Every structure is written in C-alpha cells, then in structure tokens.
From Swiss-Prot:
Family: Belongs to the TRAFAC class myosin-kinesin ATPase superfamily. Kinesin family. BimC subfamily.
UniProtKB keywords: ATP-binding, Cell cycle, Cell division, Cytoplasm, Cytoskeleton, Microtubule, Mitosis, Motor protein, Nucleotide-binding
Stated name of the protein: Kinesin-like protein KLP2
Family matches, as InterPro entries: KIF11-like, KIF11-like_kin_motor_dom, Kinesin_motor_CS, Kinesin_motor_dom, Kinesin_motor_dom_sf, P-loop_NTPase
Entries under Pfam families matching the protein: Kinesin
Stretches assigned to the Kinesin motor domain: 13-354
One CC-aspect GO term: mitotic spindle
Amino acid sequence: RSEKGCRKEKNQNIQVFVRLRPLNQRERDLKSLGVVEVHNNKEVVVRISQQNSITKKFTFDRAFAPYANQVEVYQEVVSPLIEEVLAGYNCTVFAYGQTGTGKTHTMVGENTGDETTWQKDPLAGIIPRALSQLFDELRISNTEYTVRVSYLELYNEELFDLLATSEDNSKLRIYEDVTRKGSNIVNGLEEITVYNKKEVFRIMAQGQERKKVASTLMNAQSSRSHTVFTIVVHMKENSLPEGEELVKIGKLNLVDLAGSENISKAGSDNPAKRERARECVNINQSLLTLGRVITALVERHPHVPYRESKLTRILQESLGGRTKTSIIATISPGHKDLEETMSTLEYLTEQRTFRTSLRSTRKYKESYIERISEEIAD
C-alpha cells in the first residue's frame, strides 16, 4: 500500500474500517460457529442463515481479517492521520463495537517492555503507537513543540478525569467555548505534558486504575464507559523568515466507545443487575445520538443535535468540519453474536457517506506564540 494508507483523496475526511477477531475461548466453549469472513481486504461477508446459506455483503474502506496484526491496522487506520495532525488539523479515531470484540486491544494493546519502534512493536495499540510516531516525526522536524494529553471517561452521562492528580473524583462539567464557535471546554480537565512513549504507558496505566470497570455476562472485565484520549501538539516553526512566526495546533482524539450490545445480553433481566441495564441505556443513547449527529451532518440539516448527549458535545469539534476521522469497528465471527455484528456493520455503512469540510487550526498570534515559547523553554 502507499504511505498514505487508504486515505488517498485529500478530501476524503472520514474512512470506515472493520477488524474481525478470531473465535475466542468463550465462543469455542459455546460451540459458536464462524459466520463472518473478510474478502478482498474490503468486504465483510456474513452468513445470516445456516439453513440455506444466505449471505449479506458489506463494503468498507478496508476490512482486516483475524490474522491482521497491530502494526498493519495502525499503518492503515491511524498513521496517515499523523501527517494531518502535524500540519495543524484535528483528527479522530473511533473504536466501535460490541463488548469483547477487541476495542481496547486495538486502542491500547500491551506494553512490550522493550525499546521496539512504533513501526515494529507487535503488541502496542493505537494510542501508544500514535504518540511514538508523533515524537519521532517531531524530533526530526524544524519546530519547537509541546505534546499534552488528557484522558476523559464518560460513565452514565457523567464526566470523570482519568488523569486527575487529586483523590477527588468529582464529576466534571462541560461548557461552550465562547471564543470558538462549535467548540466545548471540559472545565478542570487535567492536561499532562509528555515527552516519550514510556510516560504514555505510565499515564495510561494511571488512567486505567481510575477507570470504572464492571462484570457483564460477556466479559469479566468489561468497560461500561466511553473514554476519550486526546493528544494536543503545539508546534512553532523555526524556518520562517525573520519577523514571521507560525504556531500550529494539531489534535488527535482517540475514542474507545462503550460496548454496543443489547440490554438482555448484558444481563438486565436479572433484577440484581439493574445498574447494568441503566449503563446499557446510557451507552445506547450515546451511540444513537452519535448516529443522529452524523446523519444530520450528512444530510446538511440546519440543526445538528450535538447537545443531546455528553459524548457528542465532547466530540462536537471533531465531527463538525475541521477534522479527519477514522472509525474502526471490531466484530466477532461467532453466530451467537450475529445480531450485534449485523447492527455494527449496518451502523458503519451509514457513516461511510459522511463528509465534512476541512479547516486547519494554524494561528498567527504573537501573544500565543510567546506563551507557548515560554512553556517550551521551561
């Protein structure tokens, strides 16, 4: 493939990918049949009837078979976005799908514990690999820079800071940014300056410790929340003529969406698990609103319902018009998950038509340059 991955057209602002995982031990124990296959690196073929071999085909920008490794997925889905971030654009990666299909494996992965490069590390997920690539590119560029990260959790429509330094786990509030149309601010959200990928793993581990996890019938350590890991890069060009200065601000949002499974599968028919049912309702409401927002953008409606969920308010700037987006859905091959797999694939098919205009967040601002320069010097 080209170094641009799949994103060959400059104006193709959203791309949709699917990653099919192998049958896991739970599915083998349940004698689950494999009913999903990947053909030609773009097509997902689902056998929807065991009796008469009826199949349905879905086509995406790229489909990854079970044998696809972490490096291959990253090179196609995320690596092309890093160039955009370094040029001062906003980019977003969503991981979407049913609980237990590999979203967290795809986004976070595992720490190999050695000094492997981002191009070769066999286990790292999208978040640490993206930061490794960013640092590599920044080190060889003729710019002064700072890299900051934040890690936000949305649980039952409440916002929590996964990197908060205090023991206070109070809820955060979100406000409209009056200085920038279509942007919101999460008041009090911690932003931490990072310098290398080792720090990133430490910070992510810190965030995971604070993260709310809950058992479901499908995954003993399933997350019942959305998480948003945001990387903001401030870059000051050094190669411009004397008297001219340019600050570029690039942003990469890495969003792990909570499991999209239905309430009955999550065990809510048991009265003791009503909290799980409440979680599912909130999760599905967030995902439904996200779909409605994207539909409104596709159809150019004058009103886009960002405010109908906290998730879409947080991501408003990432969906509105100054960003490139990759959606990677993870799916199970098992016939017992067929309903959820079909729901995921149909949801994704709707999103493929979404296109937005793209605007760089380059800024010529003397006072801002001075502030960033001071931070770089510190």
